[in-house]
Amino acid sequence: YEHTAENAVVKEMLLVKFLVDSPVARTDALQIVEHFSGKTVDLTPTSMIAMFNGDSPKIDAALGMLAHFDIIETVRTGKVVMARGEQPT
């Protein structure tokens, strides 16, 4: 059975750790996180971990916008699915 956005809730989560080694880089990163309704879950003077939730195109776009930063590591869940309505998945 194929689950689609019409008959199921389909989401992914992405954690991305990257360097923010200047005030300008930090500001740019925070604007990208905010634009994609992400959340900063860890912040040090030189690095940041951002979390994004959403459908695959949104996650791909957020990661693409962060590509110009020095990315240390990423963790991505893949699709998590639950059928809409009363029917079990």
Describe the residue ranges of each PLM region:
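Long, contiguous binding/interaction regions
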Residues: 1-89
